[in-house]
Amino acid sequence: MALTISRAQYVATYGPTVGDKVRLGDTNLWATIEQDLLTKGDECKFGGGKSVRDGMAQSGTATRDNPNVLDFVITNVMIIDAKLGIIKADIGIRDGRIVGIGQAGNPDTMDNVTPNMIIGASTEVHNGAHLIATAGGIDTHIHFICPQQAQHAIESGVTTLIGGGTGPADGTHATTCTPGAWYMERMFQAAEALPVNVGFFGKGNCSTLDPLREQIEAGALGLKIHEDWGATPAVIDSALKVADEMDIQVAIHTDTLNESGFLEDTMKAIDGRVIHTFHTEGAGGGHAPDIIKAAMYSNVLPASTNPTRPFTKNTIDEHLDMLMVCHHLDKRVPEDVAFADSRIRPETIAAEDILHDMGVFSIMSSDSQAMGRIGEVVIRTWQTADKMKMQRGELGNEGNDNFRIKRYIAKYTINPAIAHGIAEHIGSLEVGKIADIVLWKPMFFGVKPEVVIKKGFISYAKMGDPNASIPTPQPVFYRPMYGAQGLATAQTAVFFVSQAAEKADIRAKFGLHKETIAVKGCRNVGKKDLVHNDVTPNITVDAERYEVRVDGELITCEPVDSVPLGQRYFLF
């Protein structure tokens, strides 16, 4: 005999289902569940008097020798994912990877259990009924200035850091490069202790090929070209030749001063080859005043950095001071002041908001400690999405914000993974990928995760007083969990390296314990492959007024006085 309960009772017990709307933090964004993969009446719920018990939703006979038995299951969770959509399901994990999105349980007593999602005595369970699951974020613009950045990143929901540097040296303060084989080895060894996945850029500024090849052979997953080292056409061509030869990505911070050519000269040097452009609006650096036009090319993978996201009343003033520090400028030198002023343009920053909302800008990143904040990639993404809804209205006619939500979450999950040849392993919650999963309470979505899971093991979480009788008493703050302790750190995070480095077995050569995974497919991607962010309109910039037009239409917006996900979340 079937039991009928009210929708309110169902949601209170098992979480929202198809058609229910969930507000994301204190934004004006509402996510509506599109599909529920669970069987009504057979939902798995752990706890006293609940269903995950021996002989009920937990098999009484299945051992871990059975490859269909899970190590970890997150039940009844709402998933927000650029590839899967906005759905309700159980997430099954085994051997550190996602093996199922569907219905977990005991096939001896339940119908419609997904074949490889058996709950047994070997399975840990986490109730996700009132949580949102997202893929761990990927930040592709890291200045590795201090190792403490990794803690702030993972506490914000970012689980993969890609960039370069050697610590607080001036070269690293300004540029995201780990120069040379010796430093590459040292940085891999240092990053063994970090609880996040890591990939390093070599220095791409060299007009001959062998100095670039040796860095890739030493482990660099890509090359970074930076204007402070000279972003000349010869350098660009050399880096891209080596990239095509060795299947790695090239990231570029172009020539703000137009010393060796203008944007058109840079695009001519790129010559249709795929490239990842950093802070493509230009405040972070790049051809003044029209680097933003690079976003219209099909071979350009355009990214933003978070200090300009979104455009607020304080954005301009803050940038001038940051720029002076990061690029070793002097306010007493007129040429330095002119350099700074040329990079900070309200008109192009305003346009950047809209280009993100249109899907023209495809990736969000931080520019950590070099004008950007490593812990604010996720926050700034959703603040931009909210601002655009308030200023531009809904996208589409769905009666919800699902398309906008999927467009924006793609910017810091799947799209940076595609750009750097690692989408086979991370960037979404699709089956087969590493189980880097972030769980959020809806009221804290985008700001403060509940739990961060790395490779199937809880690594960071909000945790109360360890001496308390239960986990929740104050003070509650982020603490490293067992997945970020001892030898487990090497088992819950990976290094992304070049194929040449993997072939050379740098893991053994450098004495590393973390798994190394080779990037691949970096040279055959284009903007068309970037999820929900593949638009390539014609962009023009007025050289005197800096006005930006898309297909002939002026695009601009007003700065805002306040943003969601802001001060009310950080009172203490």
UniProtKB/Swiss-Prot annotation:
CC cofactor note: Binds 2 nickel ions per subunit.
PTM annotation (N6-carboxylysine): residues: K224
Record PTM: Carboxylation allows a single lysine to coordinate two nickel ions.
Catalytic residues (UniProt): H327
InterPro entries named in the record: Amidohydro-rel, Metal-dep_hydrolase_composite, Metal_Hydrolase, Urease_alpha_N_dom, Urease_alpha_subunit, Urease_AS, Urease_asu, Urease_asu_c
UniProt keywords, alphabetically: Cytoplasm, Hydrolase, Metal-binding, Nickel
Residue spans crossing the bilayer: none
Binding residue positions for Ni(2+) 2: K224, H253, H279
Keyword Cytoplasm appears in the UniProt entry: yes
Pathway as given in its UniProt record: Nitrogen metabolism; urea degradation; CO(2) and NH(3) from urea (urease route): step 1/1
Disulfide bridge map: none
Compartments in which it is found: Cytoplasm
Gene Ontology molecular function, alphabetical: nickel cation binding; urease activity
Binding annotation for Ni(2+) 1: H141, H143, K224, D367
Cofactor: Ni cation
Protein's GO biological process: urea catabolic process
Chain positions recorded as substrate binding sites: H226
Pfam family, one: Urease_alpha
E.C. number: 3.5.1.5
Family the UniProt entry places it in: Belongs to the metallo-dependent hydrolases superfamily. Urease alpha subunit family.
Record protein name field: Urease subunit alpha
Species annotation: Haemophilus influenzae (strain ATCC 51907 / DSM 11121 / KW20 / Rd)
Gene name per UniProt: ureC
